[in-house]
Amino acid sequence: MSNEVKTINEFVEKYNEFKNEIGKVIVGQDIAIEQVLISIFCNGHCLLVGVPGLAKTLLVKTIADSLGLNFNRIQFTPDLMPSDIVGAEILNANREFKFIKGPLFSNIVLADEINRTPPKTQSALLEAMQERSVTNAGKKYYLDKPFFVLATQNPIEQEGTYPLPEAQLDRFMFNVVLDYPSYEEELE
């Protein structure tokens, strides 16, 4: 058996192990689990669309734990500023500026309710997604590798939101629509 075939078989085996491990915690969202894992392995990002209570945060946390990756959750709100997610320079005791990294400096970032924050902050996140780096005070800072964003949106509440334009939606590999689990899955 060639090395390529062996590598592919090992990958498939590991992928199935991850999927089964995550499925022990997240029930009834098999397609979402598949798409999120594929997106991570392909160095992409995901947008999850679903009402509250469908275990979106638990899904991301479980995936991060099973892959052994760092995880940060950012709750997007109307008053969130780009520096709140990117980080900022502060003056230290030696009167020198020091960059303090924001929550974007993690392997997996949950951008919860991305459409609740103004376009300026959305743009800072989308720049990080595209460039895998952020800019602060004219300096470029590279993000941790791997870097994966899972953003969520609530499809019901549209009042007080800032919809993502088509060009920004294009940054996501998958737009995953989550639905309620079946009665049998709920019992499980």
Say what each PLM segment does:
Residues 37-77:
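Walker A/P-loop
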Residues 83, 106-130, 144, 159-168, ...:
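Conserved AAA+/SF3 P-loop NTPase catalytic/coupling segment centered on the Walker-B
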Residues 98-107, 136-153, 164-173:
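AAA+/SF3 P-loop NTPase mechanochemical coupling elements
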Residues 35-38, 91-110:
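Conserved alpha-helical scaffold flanking the Walker A/P-loop in AAA+ ATPase domains
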Residues 51, 85, 152:
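P-loop (Walker A) phosphate-binding loop of NTP-binding proteins
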Residues 75-80, 173-184:
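Conserved AAA+ ATPase "SRH/arginine-finger" region at the nucleotide-binding site
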Residues 81-95:
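Conserved NTP-binding/hydrolysis module of P-loop NTPases
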Residues 8-54:
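Pre-Walker A (pre-P-loop) alpha-helix and adjacent loop at the N terminus of AAA/AAA+ ATPase modules
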